[in-house]
Amino acid sequence: MFDWLLEPLQFEFMQNALLTALIVSIICALLSCYLVLKGWSLMGDAISHAVLPGIVLAYLAGIPLAIGAFFSGIFCSLGVGYLKENSRIKEDTAMGIVFSGMFAIGLVMFTKIQTEEHLTHILFGNVLGVSHQELIQSAVISAIIFCLIVFKRKDFLLYCFDPSHARVAGLSPKILHYGLLILLALTIVSTMQVVGVILVVAMLIAPGITALTLTKSFDKMLWVAIASSIASSLIGVILSYHFDASTGACIILLQAAFFVIALAYSKIRIR
């Protein structure tokens, strides 16, 4: 059994993959708890699709894809905020049209590019092909996100529960709103190499809802989310190696399985 688990570690590309999955899983789990409490499941899905045009433009310009993805996500988030504040359109409606339009633009640009192999990995993930440089990039981005979440943990928590209460407490809901959006965009940039922009929303939601099903306090929710996210990511990478399956799909399937188990356990515990 141990030989089966340790066999992938003899290869450098698997070491990079496991480290990247570990780093990204922790950040996704932390942010997932806030997104679930805030009800931003659609926001994570929307931004993950909206980064595609930025990725294509960055590829054409010869700059790091992460830069294009980040600014594309932020641009669309600001666009949704502008529509919400300056029209009668509700936020979820604005997200639907803006981010779907951006993804469509990205797909059109994507199909016109001659060399598509690397960009295909961005769509569906390719953690087994992560280079040492990409590992460092994910680690740096994740460290920034981790520090910001820990530093503003209570402020974000208060904002997610009650923006009006946050305003009374002397905080700026608008700053916290866009701050959370920036963290979300950064997390998507860091995660897209693992599962791709299409499946990244699952990593941003599944750990949080699994933990919410099992716990009643936010601190416990964070720990359970981190544990389930790490377990699904590491086991998913190992399973994908042995069964020659899509790594991103294996990770997401395990997270879905953990949620089903958690939901069943919570129902049994209530009885």
Swiss-Prot record:
<dbReference type="GO" id="GO:0055085">
    <property type="term" value="P:transmembrane transport"/>
</dbReference>
<feature type="transmembrane region" description="Helical">
    <location>
        <begin position="245"/>
        <end position="265"/>
    </location>
</feature>
<feature type="transmembrane region" description="Helical">
    <location>
        <begin position="194"/>
        <end position="214"/>
    </location>
</feature>
<feature type="transmembrane region" description="Helical">
    <location>
        <begin position="55"/>
        <end position="75"/>
    </location>
</feature>
<keyword id="KW-0406">Ion transport</keyword>
<dbReference type="InterPro" id="IPR001626">
    <property type="entry name" value="ABC_TroCD"/>
</dbReference>
<feature type="transmembrane region" description="Helical">
    <location>
        <begin position="221"/>
        <end position="241"/>
    </location>
</feature>
<dbReference type="GO" id="GO:0010043">
    <property type="term" value="P:response to zinc ion"/>
</dbReference>
<dbReference type="GO" id="GO:0005886">
    <property type="term" value="C:plasma membrane"/>
</dbReference>
<keyword id="KW-1003">Cell membrane</keyword>
<dbReference type="Pfam" id="PF00950">
    <property type="entry name" value="ABC-3"/>
</dbReference>
<keyword id="KW-0812">Transmembrane</keyword>
<dbReference type="InterPro" id="IPR037294">
    <property type="entry name" value="ABC_BtuC-like"/>
</dbReference>
<keyword id="KW-0472">Membrane</keyword>
<comment type="function">
    <text>Part of an ATP-driven transport system HI_0359/HI_0360/HI_0361/HI_0362 for iron.</text>
</comment>
<feature type="transmembrane region" description="Helical">
    <location>
        <begin position="168"/>
        <end position="188"/>
    </location>
</feature>
<keyword id="KW-0410">Iron transport</keyword>
<comment type="similarity">
    <text>Belongs to the ABC-3 integral membrane protein family.</text>
</comment>
<dbReference type="GO" id="GO:0006826">
    <property type="term" value="P:iron ion transport"/>
</dbReference>
<dbReference type="GO" id="GO:0043190">
    <property type="term" value="C:ATP-binding cassette (ABC) transporter complex"/>
</dbReference>
<keyword id="KW-0813">Transport</keyword>
<protein>
    <recommendedName>
        <fullName>Probable iron transport system membrane protein HI_0359</fullName>
    </recommendedName>
</protein>
<keyword id="KW-0997">Cell inner membrane</keyword>
<keyword id="KW-1133">Transmembrane helix</keyword>
<feature type="transmembrane region" description="Helical">
    <location>
        <begin position="93"/>
        <end position="113"/>
    </location>
</feature>
<keyword id="KW-0408">Iron</keyword>
<feature type="transmembrane region" description="Helical">
    <location>
        <begin position="131"/>
        <end position="151"/>
    </location>
</feature>
<feature type="transmembrane region" description="Helical">
    <location>
        <begin position="17"/>
        <end position="37"/>
    </location>
</feature>
